[in-house]
Swiss-Prot record:
It is found in: Mitochondrion membrane. GO terms for molecular function: ATP binding; lipid binding; proton transmembrane transporter activity. This is ATP synthase subunit 9, mitochondrial. It comes from the Eukaryota. The record marks 60 as: Reversibly protonated during proton transport. The gene is ATP9. It is a multi-pass membrane protein. It comes from Chondrus crispus. Keywords: ATP-binding, CF(0), Hydrogen ion transport, Ion transport, Lipid-binding, Membrane, Mitochondrion, Nucleotide-binding, Transmembrane, Transmembrane helix, Transport.
Length: 76
């Protein structure tokens, strides 16, 4: 494989993982909001936890897509 092509793949895979930084911030915001909501209204604990898990799953889906794209760029 050409060295230029291999280095372009490495750079592309690295750039594809930039989306993971936003996911880390998003997960922090989701759970930070959960803590604030618990402090305001502890009686809604079960309902808020369900919404939090849903938000966490949707946020992590973005990370999985970015990681999948990085692997596709790197290994194809």
């Amino acid at each position: 494989m050409n060295v230029t092509l291999q280095s372009a793949k490495m750079i592309g895979a690295g750039l594809a993982t930039i989306g993971l930084t936003g996911v880390g911030a998003g997960v922090g915001i989701v759970f930070g909001s959960l803590v604030m909501a618990y402090a305001r209204n502890p009686s809604l604990k079960q309902q808020l936890f369900g919404y939090t898990i849903l938000g966490f799953a949707l946020t992590e889906a973005v990370a999985l897509f970015a990681l999948m794209m990085a692997f596709l760029i790197l290994f194809t």
